[in-house]
């Protein structure tokens, strides 16, 4: 089909008008405008299907971010200590007794947990409830060691509980009643229990049977592989239907999938985001770290965002493993304008 020059000019006019709207009225008003416009097109029968896929970008842009409430550099140093202690805990247990244990789960989620511990989780009599991803337990123990609530002897006896001075492999309130609050292994138990915990608390609160702190939250930390378990997403529609605004899922998409290979070749973040969004959840993507901010600010053509949205998980794993030169060629090299950003 021949290119329609007039249609192309009209399209550019529409895009220019949208950019004007964004510049002078802001993101929120522009989102509302776009939503109503798309709904109008849909009502006219001009859109066959609406995608629920979110862009492979951070949901909160740089100019919308709040100032970080802590000292990032000090917190980063503490994270390094915790990661190291978690690593050594597992390695020592394997060196002599071949007991197993998980290293990469906590290593990839350390920032998520530390931001939570330092700035979100609240203690006290009516504290927040946290369902920790089971395989991340070495990191939680390592943090407690820095705080002084777990001894070196405890860490040395990871997965060695017979003498009474060890640490359970995973969150286990029966074996460690003064430490763990909820069991989250086998995989899939944590997500569905968190949903029903939030549900019963909301039920009791609305009937005056439970006095809660304002904004008391139930946090559920899990991995992308765990979301394959039928229990993990089996009740997510209930959470939306019952308006459980006291529930937060944090899904660490580290692409490891300990219990099996990936089942497709796209982006698991995009897939899960679409599923939760379609079920009625508010979905927030946190994908790109602050070191990408300068590059994204220079991306006036949108080429870098195009590359991000046209790269699949398997490629991202390659980029992480094969270094800068490979990434420059095969990631930024997908678009000439993106490549110019790193020349």
Q: How should these model regions be labeled?
A:
Residues 5, 253-343:
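Long, well-ordered, tryptophan-enriched scaffold segments
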Residues 7-41, 47:
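Amphipathic alpha-helical packing elements
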Residues 33, 39-42, 48-53, 188-190, ...:
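Long, compositionally biased, glycine/small-hydrophobic-enriched stretches that function as flexible linkers
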Residues 36-60, 133, 286, 290-297, ...:
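Terminal amphipathic helices with adjacent charged low-complexity linkers/tails
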Residues 98, 103-106, 212, 221, ...:
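Conserved alpha/beta enzyme-core scaffolds, especially Rossmann-like or related mixed alpha/beta domains
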Residues 15, 146, 270-274:
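Short acidic/glycine-rich loops and adjacent helix/strand connectors
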Residues 64-82, 86-96, 102-242:
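Cofactor-binding active-site loop characterized by glycine-rich and histidine/acidic residues
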Residues 130-133, 246-254:
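Short internal beta-strands
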């Amino acid at each position: 089909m021949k290119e329609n020059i007039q249609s192309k000019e009209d399209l550019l006019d529409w895009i220019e008008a949208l950019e004007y709207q964004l510049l002078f009225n802001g993101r929120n008003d522009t989102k509302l405008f776009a939503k109503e416009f798309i709904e109008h097109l849909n009502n006219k029968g001009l859109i066959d299907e609406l995608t629920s896929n979110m862009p492979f970008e951070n949901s909160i842009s740089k100019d919308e971010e709040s100032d970080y409430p802590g000292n990032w550099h000090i917190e980063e140093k503490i994270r390094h200590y915790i990661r190291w202690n978690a690593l050594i805990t597992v390695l020592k247990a394997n060196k002599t007794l071949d007991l197993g244990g998980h290293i990469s789960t906590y290593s990839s989620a350390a920032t998520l947990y530390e931001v939570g511990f330092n700035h979100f989780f609240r203690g006290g009599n009516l504290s927040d409830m946290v369902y920790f991803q089971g395989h991340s337990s070495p990191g939680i123990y390592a943090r407690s060691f820095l705080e002084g609530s777990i001894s070196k002897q405890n860490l040395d006896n990871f997965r060695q509980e017979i003498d009474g001075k060890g640490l359970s492999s995973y969150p286990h309130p029966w074996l460690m009643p003064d430490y763990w609050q909820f069991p989250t292994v086998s995989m899939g138990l944590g997500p569905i229990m968190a949903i029903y915990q939030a549900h019963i608390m909301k039920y009791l609160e609305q009937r005056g049977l439970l006095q809660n702190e304002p904004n008391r939250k139930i946090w559920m930390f899990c991995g992308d592989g765990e979301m394959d378990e039928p229990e993990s997403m089996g009740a997510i529609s209930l959470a939306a239907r019952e308006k459980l605004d006291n529930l937060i899922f944090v899904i660490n998409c580290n692409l490891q999938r300990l219990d099996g290979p990936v089942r497709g070749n796209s982006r698991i973040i995009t897939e899960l985001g679409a599923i939760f969004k379609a079920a009625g959840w508010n979905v927030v993507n946190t994908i790109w770290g602050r070191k990408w901010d300068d590059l994204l600010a220079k991306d006036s053509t949108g080429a870098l965002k195009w590359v991000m949205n046209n790269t699949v998980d398997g490629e991202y794993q390659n980029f992480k493993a094969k270094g800068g030169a490979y990434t420059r060629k095969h990631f930024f090299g997908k678009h000439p304008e993106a490549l110019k950003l790193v020349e």
